[in-house]
């Protein structure tokens, strides 16, 4: 699998599909609640025969507005993700207002023209002069600001962590099965000494930003940043795609390879990294009072870290445990036995395997 620009675009599109579905779902739910309120309380309509037409308009607006805003968010992410937060807020506010106004006018203009047997332009004028237009516009703008505000707050936490806290998950320690991948930047001390603290900080920021799409595509949770090391995590379920988990590492490699000229021009160094992947039973729970956080405890993390630490000695970039190797059935990857090692505090050895992309050039 040779991850080209084509593959990077596919990754971005698939990431945005998730956003599109989420926004459309939120707006559809709001639309249903609004329609139900109209039906039972008659806020704007008194004739219940108008309920179905209203529901049709609400659903159409939800789909078109949701899709348009999600596409805009994808563009915003690509072009402005490193810009100041205030600039992004202003762009969102102006763009959302324009998108919402456009679809309100188009959908209701068409409906009024059909319902009153008038032209589309007359239907638009009729709708703009109604009290419903201003109420709909303000309500929808506030709704989208709330949705994206919650999404922005959620981005400050790990994937799904805010919802887990709200639902009360893991407030009591619980044993679950989880995958962990430790990814460590090579020669970070040397690079930091050569670049200095500020430029090395920018180097790390660009590196973490550039590998984000691969992480998102693989469905990983960023468990922790530890200086120049990043720890990724995946829940183990019946639907776990282990090939997609492995692909995260190779997508990250290819993303950096495609931008190596930019890194060389800007910093004189290109990020290189090694990774160790392992999985198994861990204990998960919320901890802390001043700062609440979900933590994972168990030998699985220590073993994954040890596997990553052996990459240099074994002369390879990506090592996985036998636990992972036994679950990979696709010939997309070549997995060869590398060595046995004894995790810290353990007596029994575990087998580790090097992973190579079988279809790369």
Place the predicted regions along the sequence by residue.
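Membrane-anchoring hydrophobic segments
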Residues: 1-58
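Regulatory cytosolic signal-relay segments
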Residues: 5, 115-176
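Juxtamembrane segments at transmembrane-helix boundaries
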Residues: 16, 36-49, 59-87, 102, ...
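Membrane-interface segments at the starts/ends of alpha-helical transmembrane spans
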Residues: 46-60, 89, 122-135
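Hydrophobic transmembrane alpha-helices
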Residues: 68-77, 85-131
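Catalytic NTP-binding/metal-coordinating core of nucleotidyl cyclase/transferase enzymes
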Residues: 173-247
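Catalytic core of nucleotidyl cyclases, primarily class III adenylyl/guanylyl cyclases
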Residues: 218-244, 260-299
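Cytosolic regulatory/linker segments at or just downstream of nucleotide-handling modules
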Residues: 313-361
């Amino acid at each position: 699998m040779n991850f080209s620009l084509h593959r990077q675009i596919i990754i971005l599109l698939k990431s945005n599909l998730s956003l599109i579905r989420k926004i459309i779902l939120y707006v559809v739910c709001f639309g249903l609640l609004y329609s139900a309120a109209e039906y039972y309380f008659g806020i704007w309509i008194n004739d219940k025969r108008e309920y179905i037409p209203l529901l049709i308009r609400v659903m159409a607006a939800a789909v078109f507005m949701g899709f348009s805003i999600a596409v805009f968010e994808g563009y915003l992410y690509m072009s402005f993700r490193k810009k100041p937060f205030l600039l992004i807020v202003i762009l969102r506010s102006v763009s959302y207002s324009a998108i919402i106004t456009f679809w309100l006018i188009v959908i209701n203009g068409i409906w009024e023209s059909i319902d009153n047997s008038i032209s589309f332009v007359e239907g638009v004028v009729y709708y703009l002069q109604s009290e419903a237009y201003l109420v709909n516009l303000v309500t929808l703008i506030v709704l989208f600001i709330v949705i994206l505000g919650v999404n922005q707050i959620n981005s400050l936490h790990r994937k799904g962590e805010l919802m887990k806290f709200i639902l009360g998950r893991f407030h009591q320690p619980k044993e679950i099965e989880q995958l962990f991948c430790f990814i460590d930047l090579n020669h970070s001390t040397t690079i930091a000494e050569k670049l200095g603290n500020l430029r090395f900080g920018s180097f790390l920021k660009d590196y973490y930003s550039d590998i984000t799409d691969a992480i998102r595509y693989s469905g990983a949770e960023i468990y922790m940043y530890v200086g120049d090391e990043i720890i990724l995590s995946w829940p183990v379920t019946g639907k776990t795609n282990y090939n997609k988990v492995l692909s995260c590492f190779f997508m990250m490699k290819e993303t950096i390879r495609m931008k190596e000229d930019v890194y060389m021009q800007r910093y004189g160094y290109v990020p290189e990294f090694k990774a160790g992947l392992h999985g198994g039973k861990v204990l998960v729970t919320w901890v802390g009072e001043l700062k609440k956080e979900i933590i994972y405890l168990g030998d699985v993390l220590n073993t994954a870290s040890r596997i990553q630490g052996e990459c240099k000695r074994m002369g390879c970039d990506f090592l996985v445990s036998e636990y992972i190797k036994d679950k990979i059935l696709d010939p997309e990857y070549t997995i060869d036995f590398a060595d046995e090692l004894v995790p810290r505090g353990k007596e029994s050895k575990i087998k580790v395997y090097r992973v190579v992309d079988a279809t790369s050039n």
